[in-house]
């Protein structure tokens, strides 16, 4: 293993908090990253991007949704892109349930409807409240159902051993309203 001999904890490449265990190594020093145009990084604890963005799958869609967004029976079950946020984050940012939101990273913006739910709970980390934004990654610009792609927001970072993409966690900002750029 490239980052052996012993496993240790590293915060994601973009994290809202500093690594409490290893201040001298905030991130995995062996991680693969691509310092290329269009792939800027937020840095650790960047106040411009204070929220954790996590991407995930939905039961009704397969892989990135490229195959299932074209099936009418599946499109009916999950007809649009959405983001999940807590009632606390919705109140803090003036977001209405079902209203449009814009999720922003240094790499781009995405728009979706807000699903305000207790499933996405604020966390206490490093002595402060850290809010989470959940964004299913099955949507895109083609198919019977369309929507902003969560993958447009993620950075190009991978683990050092098998190059698994670190697209499941990053930092973002979220605001009420629909961006014209997304």
What is each PLM-predicted segment?
Residues 1-43:
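Interdomain regulatory linker/hinge segments that flank or connect interaction modules
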Residues 2-6, 11, 15, 19-20, ...:
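Long, contiguous, secondary-structure-rich segments that constitute the structural scaffold
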């Amino acid at each position: 293993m490239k980052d052996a001999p012993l496993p240790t904890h590293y915060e994601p490449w973009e994290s809202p908090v500093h690594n409490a265990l290893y201040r001298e190594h905030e991130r995995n020093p062996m991680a693969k990253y691509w310092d290329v145009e269009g792939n800027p990084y937020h840095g650790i604890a960047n106040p411009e991007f204070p929220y954790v963005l996590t991407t995930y799958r939905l039961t009704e869609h397969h892989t990135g949704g490229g195959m299932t967004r074209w099936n009418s029976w599946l499109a009916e079950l999950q007809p649009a892109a959405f983001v999940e946020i807590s009632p606390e984050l919705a109140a803090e940012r003036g977001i209405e349930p079902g209203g449009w939101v814009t999720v922003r990273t240094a790499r781009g913006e995405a728009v979706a409807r807000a699903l305000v739910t207790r499933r996405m709970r604020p966390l206490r980390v490093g002595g402060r409240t850290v809010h989470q934004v959940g964004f299913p990654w099955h949507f895109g610009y083609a198919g019977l159902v369309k929507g902003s792609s969560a993958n447009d927001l993620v950075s190009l970072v991978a683990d050092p051993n098998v190059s698994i993409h670190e697209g499941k966690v990053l930092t973002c900002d979220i605001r009420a309203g629909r961006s014209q750029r997304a």
